[in-house]
């Protein structure tokens, strides 16, 4: 597939040809990365075609978050990132499959069916932005937008062999993103390479008055300032690597060796055990989800239950029939930790621990420029691999720290396991220092020159 950098130089006629080619490929593909052929969404604005995750509002398109309960909901307005794309010669073209309401790590909970990993169709593409990553890796999209709540851009990027960037919280407007966990959610790019990630990130970044959490900063210019010759002081967290598979640990050590040979300084640091982060993340995210999803009641918009006797039954049946099992599980757990008698024991304590984790990251960043970790404990696994929801939650163990602290992080493919599946590593940077993330990733990408195909 043509890169985003190349596509931006095409004429309008050439772009229309490209869109037709993508549409034909999607119709012929069995990956199920797109919810439907992009031409079926209706008219598309002029510009380079960008695949959009199904929780980002595109005016006039049915946006469902891959959930039955939102079937029939047509977005009445554009998300701010869509307006930004249009101002930068790009446009939405197709909606990607995802875990229902972005709650999952495998893209198996979508009401539209599973998405397959293009590297091995018997394996998951990761989640929740699995459709976006599978499409980019499978040559079905020039680039894509995803959302990252606990690793939902970076983990599928790692599983599929793409570049995935989670910007600093507040760097990219969330206006028009259907919320899962409002204090963690962030929109970001999934692309074929680091240059494309930089271009797409620059296009969607910047202050937005419609988002009260938007940082009052101008759009970034990271692509213009990409510098592969910078040298950085990089922290590693040895205690956190113990949960990774032997293949991931080998890729980690080999990448560290490459970074040292490139002239970067590596230092060891310590912070709170990553298993604490899992507990904190899921308590807070489920609590916020139970609040955010209360609006989907069968009354205001989306799917409504039929043959009901009263308002109470309408509410119960609409939500029971409309939400999938994982979403129901998180709503119930969220309501539990917010309930009288348990709020202080769970939610309040989790918020206090979140501050401690944020302070630990800030303390490390007083001495270093970047932190280097794996993205996931393993490469992409087979479908129906997890024996329990808890096992699935543990797959986020390396990615959630950046969400808890609001820091930017980037996933870069660095190696292949013995089965030929991609393995990604991530860099985490100081708040609003996406430039350093992209600089070191750009240099490492060229140094490794990894060929996945």
Curated annotation (Swiss-Prot):
One Pfam family it belongs to: Amidase
GO MF annotation list: ATP binding; glutaminyl-tRNA synthase (glutamine-hydrolyzing) activity
Keyword Transferase: no
Assigned keywords, A-Z: ATP-binding, Ligase, Nucleotide-binding, Protein biosynthesis
Coiled coil segments of this chain: none
EC numbers for this chain: 6.3.5.7
A GO CC term assigned to this protein in UniProt: glutamyl-tRNA(Gln) amidotransferase complex
Domain of life: Bacteria
Catalysed reactions, as listed in the record: L-glutamyl-tRNA(Gln) + L-glutamine + ATP + H2O = L-glutaminyl-tRNA(Gln) + L-glutamate + ADP + phosphate + H(+)
Protein biosynthesis in keyword set: yes
InterPro entries: Amidase (IPR000120), Amidase_CS (IPR020556), Amidase_dom (IPR023631), AS_sf (IPR036928), GatA (IPR004412)
Biological processes, Gene Ontology terms: translation
PROSITE patterns: AMIDASES
Complex formation: Heterotrimer of A, B and C subunits.
Function: Allows the formation of correctly charged Gln-tRNA(Gln) through the transamidation of misacylated Glu-tRNA(Gln) in organisms which lack glutaminyl-tRNA synthetase. The reaction takes place in the presence of glutamine and ATP through an activated gamma-phospho-Glu-tRNA(Gln).
Stated family: Belongs to the amidase family. GatA subfamily.
NCBIfam families xrefs: gatA (TIGR00132)
Name of the protein this chain belongs to: Glutamyl-tRNA(Gln) amidotransferase subunit A
Species of provenance: Helicobacter pylori (strain G27)
